Amino acid sequence: MGGTLQKGDSSRASLPETKLEAKILETMRRRESEGSSLKSFNSLILKFPKIDENLRKCKAVFEEFDTDGNGAIDQQELNHCFRKLEIGFTEEETNDLFEACDINDDRGMKFNEFIVLLCLVYLLKDDPAAQHAKSRIGLPNLEATFETLVDAFVLLDKNKDGHVSKREMVEAINETTSGERSSGRIAMKRFEEMDWDKNGMVNFKEFLFAFTRWVGIEDNDDEEDDEGDGEEEG
């Protein structure tokens, strides 16, 4: 792996590694120029219960396309999902998205990974150069929730460079906690939860994975549901 990043390396950390990451970054920067409807991190926190509720409604979509019922969506099932939802991505784009969101490298997306993938698709369909259908992802009820997640990232990314830095996270938390002594620790904890690759910068995908955990959605939700179903039947 690469060496530890030094203080002056933030610009290097922000360079996208793949064509998909470059496209996500470009689309996010364009979206950030429009600003956020959220006024503070606290206003986002107040939306957590509703966001959690709406994301869990996505479970039915997940189960519909998990045709073999193994609790994960594989590449073939994702291709079928995109065709059914009329998401007009190329095979290369679909493969890249699958690889990007299959963070466990087990050739199957769990529920939380599927949510992240759909939200990335929602963002990418904001590309004015793309000729797509009226509903971005064929799931209009979920799109308002995804827009809130995009709004949240835009709120945090004060300098609109497509990444959230440690300083920006501290600033957002400080605005919420009104100078409480614990605010710095809270901000650092939240940032560390987001910064998976420890490069000091958080991209939109990292933010989404952290956010699903914040609202209570984990990658083992399917297993917990199965256990719960079994107990009820007994």
PLM feature spans:
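C-terminal interaction modules of eukaryotic adaptor/scaffold proteins
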Residues: 13-14, 180-234
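EF-hand Ca2+-binding helix-loop-helix modules
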Residues: 2-69, 75-76, 91-100, 105-156, ...
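Eukaryotic modular interaction domains in large regulatory/scaffold proteins
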Residues: 146-199, 203
